[in-house]
C-alpha cells in the first residue's frame, strides 16, 4: 500500500504538465529520477559537505550526467533555489556545463509544450544566465526556443516566449552578433513573426521587434544576404511598415548603402534559402506530424490525419499564415526517395493541394499560391532542384479532370504572377517559369502539357491567358526542343522585350507596384475574383482519397480532347454529369435555364420550384438541381466590373442587375409568401457557394427601387429588409453579423459603391447600423476628404443618420483606439449631427492627454462655445492631474475666465466647499444647488490640484481674478482650515491667495450657530475687500526678482495662522 502511495506521489511532476491518463515517457522518468537521486545525496548536508561529495561523485560519467540533470530540474522548477543551484553547478561541473546545455536543448526541442508555466519562465531565466556567462553551445538552446516561437499564434504563452527572447537578444546584442547563423535565424524568424503582430493590442511589442530587426539587418547585412529568396518573400508581407519601407528603398535603389558586396535584390532572389531557415519556422511537433503524413500515410487514408492537423494548427484566424510556411517546408525540405515515389504513400502535391484549397482567408490563400510557385520564378536548372517545382505542376495536372477549379485558380495565378511579380525584370521571371516547364517535360514529370493547358474544362478567358503567356508550350511536342533553356533566346526578343520596352517605370516612388515588385497581400482582390473558394465537401473529395486511384493513372491526350473547346466551363461540367430525371413540374423550366442561362428562364424555374414540397424530390435529384444551379449562377456573374459604371444612367444600371443571380433577388422581392423546404435548401447552398450574395442583394435593391420608381412615379418602391433577413436565415447567421461581413467585403471590392449604399444601409437597418462601431470603422478606413464632405452633406440634408444620442458615448469610447485620421473624420461627423454636449461629456474624466489627443482637441473646441455649468466643471475637475498639470483643464478655465469669471469662480468655490463639513455641526450637509451627486465627483485634492496648476499658468496677474471673489476666498479659507499639514504645505501658494481680513472675519463670523454666510449680494465692505484681494494677488504675481514667491507665501501663511490662532482664543 505504501509503495502504491509513493508511486502516485512520484507521478506528480513539477516540470511537466501531466493529466491522469498521461504515461511518463523515458525523458520524464529520467529527469525525475535524477532529481530524486540528487535530493537523497545532498539532503541534510552543508554547502561545503555537498560540494566535496559532489566533486567526488562527478568523476564518474553516469553520476555526472545524473547530477547535472538533477541540478537542471531544480533550476527549472524552484525559482527560489535557482540562483544558488546555478552557483553550485558551476562549481561541480567538469565539462563547462555541456551536459546541462545538451539536455536542455533536447528538453526544449521535444518537451517544450509539456513544460509547466513555472518551468517556462525559469527556462528564460536560465537562458539569460547562460548567455551572460557565455556558456558554450547555448546558441543551440536559443535556436530551438526560436522554433517554439510559432507563427500564426498570438496566444499569451507564445507572446511571452517571443518577447523574452527579444529582450535577451537586445540585452546581449554583442554576443548575438558573434554568431552569424543565429543572427540569420533571428532575423528570419522575427520578420516572419512581425507579420502576425498587426493587432493594435500588440503595437508596443511590434515596435520593439521592428526596431531590433531593422537595426540588426542594417548592421549585419553581410550575414543577411545568405537568407536568399524566401527572406524577400517575408519582407514583402511587412513592406508597409515605415521602417521596412525605408529598407525596401535602400534594397531597390541604393544597395551599396547596405553592404559593398550587395548588388541588388536580384542577388537575393537567385540564392536558394537554406532548409534550416525554412525548418525554424515550423514547431518541432508540427514538423514531425507533417513529415509523418508525407512519409507513412497511404494515399486515400489521409483524411483523418488532415482533420486532426486542421483542428490542431488552423483553429484561429491568425493561423492561416502558417500555410505558406508549411508549403515552403514541404517543397524544399521533404524530398521523397524513388521508393516512396513508387509506393502508395500520399504524394506531396496532394498535401499541398489540401493546404491551398482548404484556406478560406484570401490573403493567406494568395500567399500560399505564391509559396507553391515561388521557385518557378527564379528557376535555374544548373543550380536549383527539380523537386522544388514538381509539386506545382502535379497538383494542377492531377486535378484538371475531376476538379478543374483547383487547376483553374492555380493556372490563372501562375499566368498573372509571371507578368506582375517583378515588372521591372519581367523578362527574367518569364525565363525562370519557362525553364521550369522545359525541365518538367524533359524529366517526364508529366508526359506533356496539352491536357492541362488545352483542357476544355478551362474557361475561354483563362485559355486565352495561357496562350498569351505560354504560346510555345501549346505547339506540338516535336517542336519543344527549340524552347528556352538557361540563356535568353529569340523567344525573349519576340515576346518579352516588346512588352518590357513599352512599359515605363516611375522609380521615384517606393511603392512596390511602381518598382515592379508586387505585394501579394495588395493584389488579393484580383485573386479573389478569379478564385473559387471550394466547399468542405469539394475539398474532401479532391484530396481525401476518393479519387486516389483515378489520379494515380496517367491520362492520355485522347481522353481529354473533345470538340467542345469553345464551350463555357459550366457547360463542360454539366455535359460530364449524367442526366437526372426530375419532376414534371420543373423538368422543362430547369432544362431551359441550363440551356439559355438567363434571368428570364431562371425566374420561370424558380416560380415552378418554389411551391414544391420535399416529397417531390429524391435526395440525389435535389442535389443535382442545386449543384448545377449554384454553378451556373457563379459562372454567369462577370469576373470584372460587376457594378454599374454610372449611378444615374438607366441603361448601365439595368445592365448591371441583368444576370441570373439578380433574377433570384427580383423573384424574392416580388414574392413574399413562405417557401417550402427544397427552396430554402437551394437558397442556403447559393449563399454558401456565392459569398458575395449579401452585398450584391443590397446593391440590387438600391438599383431596382431606383429604376422602378422612375418607371412608375405613382408608386414608391422601398428596400425590403425582409429579403436580406431571408438570406441571413438561409446562411444560418445573425443579421448583424451578416451585414457587417457584407459591408466589409463590399468596401474591399468597391469603395464608391459602398459609400453610395451607405445612406440606405443606415436608413433601412437603423437599429443595427446606428452607433455601430464596426460599421463606422469600415466607413472611416476608406474615406478621404471628399467622401467626408459628401457624408456631411447627406447628414445636413437629413438623408443620413449615423449616430443617435443614446449610446453615442459608448461608440466614442470604442473609437478612441482608431487611427488619428479616422478619429478626426469621426468628430466632424459627430459635429454634423448637432449632438448636445451633455450626451458625451461623461467621457471627459476618461480621456488622457497622451493617448487621446484627438478627442481632447474636439472637446476643447466644443467647450469654447459653451458656458460653464456645475456638471461640466465637476467632470473636468474629476480628471487626473499629473505633476505638470492638465493643459486641457487649464486651457478651458483660462478661456472661460475671460467671459464668465464670476460664474466660474462661484461654481468651483461651491464644489470645493462641498468637500468639507459644514461649520455648524448640527446642520445636515446638503450639496450646493445645481451640483449633482455622482460617483465621479472630484476629491478636494483634485480641485486644489487643478486650481494650483491654473494659478501657475497665470502670468503678470492675468486670469487671477478667479481667486478674488468672495465665494472663492471663503472656499480657500475653508480648505485651509480643514487640510492637514502636508496639504497645507503642498498648496501653500494657493492658500496664500486668501485675504487676511476675510480669513479672520470668516472664522469669527462662522463661529455662531446658525449664522448665515454672505449671499451673492455684496455690500460696500465686501466690495472693498475684493479690491484689496485683487491688489494683493497682483502683488504676488508681479513681485520683482529680489522677492521669492514661495518665501512670501510661507510668511503669509504663518501670519494668517497666527491670526487664526488669536481669533480662536478671542472666541473662546
UniProtKB/Swiss-Prot annotation:
> Which residue pairs form cystines in this protein?
none
Pfam families to which the protein is assigned, alphabetical: HEAT_Ints3_C, Ints3_N
UniProt keyword Zinc, yes or no: no
Superkingdom field: Eukaryota
Please name the InterPro entries in this protein's record. HEAT_Ints3_C, INTS3, INTS3_N
The answer to whether UniProt assigns keyword Nucleus to this entry is: yes
What are the record's GO terms for cellular component?
A: cytoplasm; nucleus
Q: Where is this region: Disordered?
A: 916-939, 1001-1068
Residue list for modification Phosphoserine? 1038-1039, 1043-1044
Q: What keywords is this UniProt entry annotated with?
A: Cytoplasm, Nucleus, Phosphoprotein
Question: Where in the cell?
Answer: Nucleus; Cytoplasm
Describe the subunit structure. Belongs to the multiprotein complex Integrator, at least composed of IntS1, IntS2, IntS3, IntS4, omd/IntS5, IntS6, defl/IntS7, IntS8, IntS9, IntS10, IntS11, IntS12, asun/IntS13, IntS14 and IntS15. The core complex associates with protein phosphatase 2A subunits mts/PP2A and Pp2A-29B, to form the Integrator-PP2A (INTAC) complex.
**Tell me, what does this protein do in biology?**
Component of the integrator complex, a multiprotein complex that terminates RNA polymerase II (Pol II) transcription in the promoter-proximal region of genes. The integrator complex provides a quality checkpoint during transcription elongation by driving premature transcription termination of transcripts that are unfavorably configured for transcriptional elongation: the complex terminates transcription by (1) catalyzing dephosphorylation of the C-terminal domain (CTD) of Pol II subunit Polr2A/Rbp1 and Spt5, and (2) degrading the exiting nascent RNA transcript via endonuclease activity.
**Member of which family?**
Belongs to the Integrator subunit 3 family.
Return the protein name. Answer: Integrator complex subunit 3 homolog
Q: Which organism is it from?
A: Drosophila sechellia
Amino acid at each position: 500500500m505504501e509503495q502504491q502511495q509513493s508511486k502516485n506521489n512520484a507521478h506528480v511532476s513539477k516540470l511537466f504538465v501531466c493529466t491522469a491518463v498521461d504515461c511518463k515517457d523515458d525523458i520524464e522518468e529520467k529527469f525525475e529520477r535524477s532529481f530524486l537521486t540528487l535530493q537523497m545525496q545532498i539532503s541534510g548536508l552543508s554547502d561545503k559537505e555537498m560540494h566535496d561529495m559532489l566533486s567526488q561523485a562527478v568523476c564518474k560519467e553516469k553520476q555526472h550526467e545524473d547530477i547535472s540533470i538533477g541540478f537542471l530540474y531544480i533550476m527549472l522548477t524552484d525559482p527560489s533555489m535557482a540562483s544558488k543551484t546555478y552557483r553550485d553547478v558551476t562549481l561541480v561541473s567538469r565539462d563547462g556545463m555541456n551536459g546541462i546545455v545538451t539536455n536542455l536543448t533536447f528538453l526544449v526541442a521535444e518537451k517544450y509544450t509539456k513544460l509547466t508555466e513555472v518551468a517556462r519562465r525559469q527556462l528564460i531565466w536560465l537562458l539569460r544566465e547562460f548567455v551572460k556567462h557565455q556558456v558554450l553551445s547555448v546558441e543551440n538552446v536559443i535556436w530551438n526556443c526560436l522554433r517554439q516561437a510559432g507563427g500564426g499564434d498570438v496566444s499569451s504563452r507564445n507572446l511571452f516566449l517571443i518577447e523574452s527572447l527579444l529582450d535577451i537578444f537586445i540585452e546581449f546584442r554583442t554576443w548575438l552578433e558573434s554568431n552569424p547563423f543565429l543572427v540569420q535565424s533571428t532575423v528570419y524568424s522575427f520578420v516572419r513573426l512581425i507579420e502576425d503582430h498587426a493587432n493594435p493590442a500588440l503595437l508596443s511589442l511590434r515596435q520593439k521587434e521592428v526596431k531590433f530587426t531593422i537595426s540588426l539587418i542594417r548592421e549585419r547585412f553581410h550575414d543577411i544576404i545568405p537568407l536568399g529568396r524566401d527572406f524577400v518573400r517575408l519582407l514583402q508581407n511587412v513592406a508597409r511598415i515605415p521602417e521596412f519601407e525605408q529598407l525596401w528603398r535602400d534594397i531597390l535603389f541604393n544597395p551599396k548603402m547596405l553592404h559593398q558586396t550587395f548588388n541588388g535584390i536580384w542577388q537575393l532572389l537567385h540564392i536558394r534559402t537554406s532548409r534550416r531557415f525554412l525548418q525554424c519556422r515550423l514547431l518541432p511537433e508540427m514538423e514531425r506530424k507533417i513529415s509523418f503524413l508525407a512519409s507513412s500515410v497511404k494515399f486515400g487514408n489521409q483524411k483523418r490525419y488532415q482533420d486532426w492537423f486542421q483542428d490542431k494548427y488552423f483553429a484561429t484566424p491568425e493561423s492561416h499564415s502558417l500555410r505558406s510556411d508549411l508549403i515552403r517546408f514541404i517543397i524544399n525540405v521533404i524530398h521523397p526517395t524513388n521508393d516512396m515515389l513508387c509506393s502508395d504513400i500520399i504524394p506531396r502535391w496532394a498535401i499541398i493541394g489540401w493546404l491551398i484549397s482548404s484556406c478560406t482567408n484570401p490573403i493567406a490563400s494568395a500567399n500560399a499560391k505564391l509559396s507553391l510557385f515561388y521557385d518557378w520564378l527564379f528557376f535555374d536548372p544548373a543550380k536549383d532542384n527539380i523537386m522544388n517545382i514538381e509539386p506545382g505542376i502535379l497538383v494542377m495536372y492531377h486535378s484538371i479532370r475531376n476538379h478543374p477549379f483547383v487547376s483553374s485558380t492555380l493556372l490563372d495565378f501562375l499566368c498573372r504572377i509571371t507578368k506582375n511579380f517583378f515588372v521591372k525584370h519581367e523578362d527574367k521571371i518569364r525565363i525562370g517559369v519557362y525553364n521550369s516547364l522545359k525541365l518538367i517535360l524533359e524529366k517526364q514529370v508529366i508526359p506533356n502539357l496539352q491536357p492541362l493547358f488545352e483542357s476544355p474544362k478551362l474557361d475561354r478567358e483563362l485559355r486565352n491567358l495561357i496562350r498569351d503567356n505560354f504560346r510555345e508550350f501549346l505547339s506540338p511536342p516535336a517542336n519543344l526542343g527549340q524552347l528556352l533553356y538557361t540563356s535568353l533566346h529569340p523567344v525573349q526578343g519576340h515576346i518579352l522585350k516588346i512588352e518590357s520596352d513599352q512599359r515605363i517605370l516611375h522609380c521615384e516612388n517606393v511603392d512596390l507596384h511602381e518598382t515592379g515588385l508586387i505585394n501579394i497581400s495588395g493584389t488579393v482582390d484580383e485573386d479573389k475574383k478569379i478564385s473559387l473558394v471550394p466547399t468542405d465537401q469539394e475539398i474532401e473529395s479532391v484530396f481525401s482519397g476518393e479519387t486516389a486511384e483515378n489520379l494515380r493513372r496517367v491520362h492520355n491526350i485522347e481522353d481529354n480532347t473533345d470538340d467542345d473547346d469553345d464551350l463555357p466551363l459550366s457547360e463542360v461540367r454539366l455535359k460530364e454529369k449524367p442526366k437526372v430525371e426530375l419532376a414534371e413540374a420543373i423538368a422543362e423550366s430547369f432544362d431551359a435555364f441550363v440551356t439559355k442561362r438567363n434571368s428570364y428562364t431562371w425566374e420561370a424555374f424558380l416560380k415552378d420550384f418554389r411551391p414544391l414540397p420535399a416529397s417531390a424530390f429524391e435526395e440525389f435529384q435535389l442535389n443535382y438541381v442545386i449543384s448545377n444551379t449554384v454553378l451556373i449562377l457563379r459562372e454567369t456573374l462577370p469576373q470584372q466590373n460587376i457594378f454599374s459604371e454610372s449611378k444615374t444612367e438607366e441603361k448601365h444600371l439595368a445592365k448591371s442587375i441583368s444576370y441570373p443571380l439578380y433574377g433570384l433577388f427580383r423573384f424574392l422581392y416580388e414574392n413574399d409568401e413562405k417557401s417550402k423546404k427544397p427552396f430554402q435548401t437551394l437558397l442556403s447552398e447559393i449563399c454558401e457557394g456565392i459569398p458575395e450574395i449579401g452585398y450584391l442583394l443590397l446593391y440590387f435593391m438600391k438599383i431596382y427601387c431606383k429604376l422602378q420608381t422612375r418607371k412608375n412615379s405613382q408608386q414608391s418602391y422601398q428596400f425590403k429588409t425582409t429579403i436580406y433577413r431571408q438570406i441571413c436565415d438561409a446562411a444560418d447567421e445573425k443579421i448583424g453579423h451578416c451585414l457587417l461581413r457584407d459591408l466589409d467585403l463590399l468596401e474591399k471590392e468597391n469603395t464608391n459603391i459602398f459609400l453610395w449604399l451607405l445612406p440606405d444601409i443606415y436608413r433601412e437597418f437603423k437599429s443595427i447600423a446606428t452607433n455601430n462601431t464596426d460599421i463606422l470603422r469600415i466607413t472611416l478606413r476608406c474615406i478621404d476628404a471628399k467622401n467626408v464632405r459628401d457624408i456631411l452633406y447627406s447628414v445636413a440634408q437629413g438623408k443620413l443618420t449615423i449616430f443617435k444620442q443614446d449610446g453615442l458615448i459608448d461608440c466614442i469610447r470604442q473609437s478612441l483606439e482608431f487611427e488619428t485620421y479616422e478619429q478626426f473624420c469621426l468628430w466632424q461627423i459627430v459635429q454634423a449631427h448637432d449632438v448636445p454636449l451633455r450626451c458625451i461629456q461623461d467621457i471627459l474624466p476618461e480621456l488622457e492627454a497622451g493617448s487621446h489627443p484627438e478627442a481632447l482637441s474636439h472637446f476643447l473646441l466644443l467647450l469654447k462655445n459653451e458656458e460653464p455649468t456645475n456638471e461640466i466643471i465637476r467632470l473636468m475637475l474629476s480628471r487626473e492631474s499629473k505633476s505638470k498639470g492638465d493643459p486641457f483643464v487649464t486651457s478651458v478655465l483660462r478661456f472661460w475666465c475671460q467671459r464668465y469669471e464670476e460664474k466660474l469662480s462661484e461654481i468651483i468655490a461651491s464644489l470645493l466647499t462641498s468637500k468639507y463639513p459644514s461649520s455648524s455641526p448640527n446642520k445636515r450637509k446638503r450639496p450646493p444647488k445645481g451640483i449633482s451627486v455622482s460617483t465621479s465627483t472630484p476629491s478636494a485634492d483634485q480641485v486644489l490640484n487643478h486650481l494650483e496648476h491654473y494659478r501657475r499658468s497665470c502670468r503678470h496677474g492675468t486670469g487671477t481674478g478667479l481667486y478674488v471673489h468672495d465665494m472663492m476666498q471663503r472656499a480657500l479659507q475653508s480648505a485651509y482650515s480643514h487640510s492637514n499639514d502636508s496639504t497645507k504645505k503642498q498648496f501653500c501658494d494657493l492658500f496664500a491667495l486668501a485675504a487676511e481680513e476675510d480669513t479672520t472675519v470668516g472664522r469669527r463670523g462662522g463661529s455662531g450657530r446658525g449664522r448665515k454666510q454672505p449671499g451673492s449680494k455684496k455690500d460696500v465692505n465686501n466690495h472693498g475687500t475684493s479690491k484689496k484681494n485683487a491688489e494683493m494677488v497682483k502683488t504676488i504675481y508681479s513681485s520683482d526678482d529680489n522677492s521669492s514667491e514661495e518665501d512670501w507665501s510661507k510668511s503669509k501663511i504663518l501670519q494668517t495662522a497666527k491670526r487664526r490662532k488669536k481669533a480662536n482664543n478671542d472666541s473662546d
